[in-house]
A protein has these predicted regions:
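Positively charged, solvent-exposed patches that mediate nucleic-acid binding
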Residues: 1-112
Length: 112
């Protein structure tokens, strides 16, 4: 299994958020930008306005796992940042709900 390449630096996130195209789902907003490389880079951001750290970490784990399962079927050469929508209820953050939402976002972005 391939390791997920992640965006780590603040300027990498800012670059994708400012120059990338965005696609809105029910639970997440995906910002996608071409990177002219032969691999995808991935990042997740959850606002501190959403609960305590345990809730935010749970949300990030679910989103990362959904990305990991879709990673093999995606087109290569993109930077992808997922933002969790603040108006979504934490109780709705079930893996089955989020994976359907992320699949729809990738379909709309023509990444499959």
């Amino acid at each position: 299994m391939k390791k997920i390449k992640t965006l780590k630096k603040n300027y990498e996130f800012k670059n994708v958020l400012s120059k990338g195209r965005f696609y809105v789902g029910k639970y997440v907003i995906a910002y996608i930008q071409k990177n002219n490389k032969n691999e995808n880079f991935f990042g997740v951001a959850v606002s501190t306005k959403i609960g305590k750290a345990t809730k935010r970490n749970r949300i990030k784990r679910v989103i990362r796992e959904c990305y990991r399962l879709n990673q093999a079927r995606l087109k290569k050469g993109f930077n992808i940042v997922f933002l969790y929508k603040k108006d979504s209820k934490f109780e709705d953050i079930k893996f089955s709900n989020v994976i359907v939402d992320i699949n729809e976002v990738f379909d709309r972005a023509n990444m499959v």
